């Protein structure tokens, strides 16, 4: 239940929309008309998403081996997700896909965890043998995915999107895995150099067609930089953004620099990038600590940036039923709030993270009027 003062703040900041108005399915009643909702800019929503959306559970024997060696790591990796289509049906509007580069195919077909516990759950060797980006969390340890090939993940999201053309924009964020696991016998990871970055964009554009993505170039328009466009309020309205997908690389400055190359912003690129608020490429930012970074998140949202934060991390909130980060995330105004628990894990307790009011998306409590 929203506190009355907070509900009033949402109403005031969202051009007269009620705090309970579901932006994906406006009721048509006063305070929730389709016209009023569609007049909002896409950065004026707030929606839920999932963290490491592709992640399947580590097989029991492999988890037992990991727990015997590193109980804390085992705890932090002890979560999983349902297929992407089911998550989207459940209201997730932000997904996270982590991937490794596999230009020739077959690099990740023999993970150490599987070698140590061979009689475990099936592994899609056919998919892992193909060339292309492979979606997984930790090579050799936490490597099972609901969609092992990045392009297959894209195809699943696109199919759902085409079947639900009125959905609010879906954000997909990416971690590009290239840090070597310091374990004897671990597979060497390939670096994301300029060639690999171009290959990522090529995979994106092999699935999503022009007009199905919200791209940096579209937002930048005639502005000198993406940041200038965002500060000037250049995000599309919800009317224009419905049925579309936005992609963002959530990576270090060094990795982002390779993707940007000599570009002033992100000209010609398919993805937005996580960067600091002052960068010419600023449009999206990841700030995953909603308590510590609450003021920074609010400032970024008010300036026009789109922010992703987390309601929980590493299973700790679920184990302790600690709702403080979740509530701070909602109050921060971050447009996309990520969780591992859109439903409780009954092993731990009642903790879950769902948008206040129960809708798919609501008017952002911080972003302001259109």
Question: Language-model segments: which ranges?
Answer:
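Catalytic cores of phosphodiester-bond hydrolases, prominently lipid phosphodiesterases
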Residues: 13-370
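Bacterial N-terminal signal peptides
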Residues: 3-13
